[in-house]
Each structure stands twice: as structure tokens, then as C-alpha cells.
Amino acid sequence: MRVETHSPSFTNPNPAEACSGDPTEMGSRLSGVSRAPLPHAAAGRDGEAAAAGKIGAFLRKAVAAQSYGLMFANGKLFEATGDALEKREQYGFSALKRLDGLSRRNLDAVAARLGALDSAEQALKQHIMAGAWHFRHQSNAALDDGEKATIASNHLLSRQARSSGGNTFADDKALLSNHDFVFFGVEFSGRDKNDKPLNHKHSTMDFGANAYVVSDALPACRNGYLTLTDHFFNRVPGGREAEHQDFVGRFAQMGRESGRWIHEGKYRQNAPLFCYRDMKAAVALHLIEFMRNSQDEAFKAYVFDQATQSGPALDRVLNSVFQAEFHIPRLMATTDYAKHPLRPMLLKEAVDSVNLPALSDLVSNRGDAVTAMWHAINKGKDEVVAYLLGNWQFEAKDFSHAPAGFYHELNYALSESGASVYILDQFLSRGWAAVNAPFEHVNRGDTMLDNAVKYGNREMVAALIKHGADRNLLSKWHKSDLDALLA
């Protein structure tokens, strides 16, 4: 699951051109669009404010075009389905037109399968389309300052050499290349954003202790896209996998039926995409299709009789039949949000997400600080180590044995694949690790220099040699590798 910049309000909430526009090149100037909320425009404002709002809307579309261009031009799935764009340095509004075309095609496909709707189905569709939705981003990271929430895409964080942890992996990038979007779960209840979310998981995953909630009317959402499932896995968790077992348990047949792939075409990972204009109609029609195919008469009666009368009841239905995921391009920076603690944060989570305010609350003694330091070593979190070094006093004996739950001794952890050279240097400089001490467990007898050579880490090799690493202690098969690495 799973960056927000915001645009002006529109008189027509679903303009025909919401997903498209004239091809326009913005060039490298777009790289400067980052974390400032863009101005809103509303009826009754003076001409200057309205003009600023139009500029903000244009910039949001221009940035969104880059996110969609990156996805459609680089995702292997879109190449396989014939929907890929040509790779370019910068993308015009044709990238948004591609989304618009896919969305319309996917909506037409489900509408064609259904044919004419009866009166009850029509009423259900209208009820869903008239509903107010909210989008929920869960995270352990510190994404707000109490006044403004700023959530960046994986792609933007990488470009800025920043990371607070994430859930985007190489397979996601290769198949979909959708890592320039911010991911949200969907709250369908229509309750206010200040009300605690009804859902705390997405596709069985708990993505964090805090939820940042925004309205679907937020201008930045107008350039987003919706999938009915997790976009990558594209499967609804049904039955015992579902989050709300109390609800699914009432409709056992529905629970069994809901665990499924939702796709168009022959590729089951080809999750149908829907732009902002089409997303509510898509959810309504796919729900009707599910109900027509369902054998659970009690569930169908519940939907028509109760879910149309209660927002929370409708949310239970839609978050059981689907696991909808909304995606906002690149960045969301807004003051119009609500933050909800869903559960206590774990120390490991605060370290992994580099949430220093939470870490400060969770570390109350040196024992906590030592445990946090081990987590930071394992994850290569330089900023956390710097924070701990600046706020706590440590001794070498604090790290002589790994705490419960950690699998490697200190020297191995400091030099394994992906380890931080900054953290290694800090420990060696303070005498908390012996540069030539042999490993006692994994690869017994090897030293940190063996690990650095094995993983081809020239920077780490240089740091170890600076601190007196003895190349004569290298395993025989690593000596020639060291020469090649330093050549």
C-alpha cells in the first residue's frame, strides 16, 4: 500500500477531462515541484487567487503526467497488455490520456457484462456514487508536523536520497513501475475524516501504527487512480484472511467467494485501473457483478436492505468484497487531513521508519537505547544512530552480546551486506568493535574485512583499512578479491 500536492476545487466534481488534457511538456522544471501545498481556487475569490488556482491545477496535472509516464513506459505488465508508452525523459499529458482510455475501457467492460440494471441495482449504484469517501495512508513514519502532512512517493524519496522505510520492492517496480505514487486504503463509510478509520489493514497487511486520512474531495485526488485490490498482488483476501471476521463470519458463502483475483484480460495481475472520474461507478458496477454471481442470498439481502441505509455497513461490504487502493501522484502536502493513532508503535517500527519523535517517547532508559541501536545497525539507519549517539551514553560492553531476537554478533552485523559504513566507522572510532576480531558464529574465523570484500563494498574496505584491518587475516579465497576490488 502504502505524497500529496493539492489543486483547486472544481464546480463540476467529475469533469470529463479529469483524467486527460492537451499534451504539454514541462521539461526539467518539474523537478522543482516538491513539498509546498499548491493554492486552491474557489467561487467568489478575486481574479488573482483564481489565476493562482488554475496554475496550481496545471502544475498538479503536469507532475501527475510524469508519474503516469514512468508507470506506463516502464511497467512490464503494460508492455505485455499493449498499453505501454514510449520511454521519454519527460512526459506530456498523453500519459493522463492513457489512464483515461484504460479507465473507460475497464468501466465499459464491466458495464457490458452486466447489461441493464434493475431498479434495486440502479439505486445501489447511485447510492455508492453519491457517497463521500476518505483515503487512509498508514505508516510508522513521522509524516506531519501537527499542521501539515507531507507524504512522498518511493520514487521521490529515492531522488532526494531520503527514506523512512517503505513497502515498495523490486518486483513492484519491474511489473508496474508505480513507485511514483502514494498509496491509500479507502474508507467508504462517509464519516468525517476526524472519525477514527473503520479499517486498520490492507490486503491482510498492517502498514503502520498511524493513519493519515484525507477526503476524496481533496484537489490532489483528482489526478489519482483506483484499483479494486492491492495493485501488485491484485487479490482480495477472503474468508479467514479478511480483516473483519465478525462481519465475514455472518456470510460464510460470501467470505469464500470474495477471495479472488479481479482482472481484465488474460493476465490475472492486470488489475483494472480507474481514474477519479470513473472510480465510484467502477466500485458500484463491480459490486453488482459480484452480487449477481454470489450464491449468498443473505448477503445480497443485507446489501440492498441495510448497507444502503448505513455508512459503516456499506464500508464493511465494500472492504470485504474489495480491498480498494487509491494512488496519488508523487506527493501529498496538505493541511486538510486528520491523523489517527491506531495502535501503539513498536520500538523496531520507530527505528525502521526513522521516526525520531516516536523513538524519543519509546526509549526511556539505556537498555531501550541499546536495543534501538541494534535495530539501527541491522537496518542501516544512520540518522537513528546519530540521534542515539547524541542523546545516550554507551560503552563497549553494551554491545558485547546481541539482545534476544538478533541473530548476528556485532562485528558480523556491522559488516554484512547492506550495512552502513557510517555506523561501522562510529563503532570502530569509539572502540566498541575490534576491527580484526574473528567471527564466532556465522562464517567462524572470518573478519569484517572478509565480509566487505565478499560483498564488494569498496567504501567499507577503505574504512576498515583506515582503522587497521589486517589483510593477512583474510580467508585465502578473499585475498585476490581484495586486490581486484582495490585495483
Curated annotation (Swiss-Prot):
NAD(+) binds at H137, Q138, S139, S164, N167, T168. One of its GO terms (cellular component) is extracellular region. Changing H327A: In EH/AA mutant; abolished arginine ADP-riboxanation of host CASP4/CASP11. The record marks H137, F183, F207, D230 as: Important for catalytic activity. Pfam families: Ank_3, Shigella_OspC. ANK repeats lie at residues 368-398, 444-473. It is found in: Secreted; Host cytoplasm. It catalyses: L-arginyl-[protein] + NAD(+) = ADP-riboxanated L-argininyl-[protein] + nicotinamide + NH4(+) + H(+). This is Arginine ADP-riboxanase OspC3. Its EC number is 4.3.99.-. Residues 1-14 have a biased composition (Polar residues). The active site is at E325.
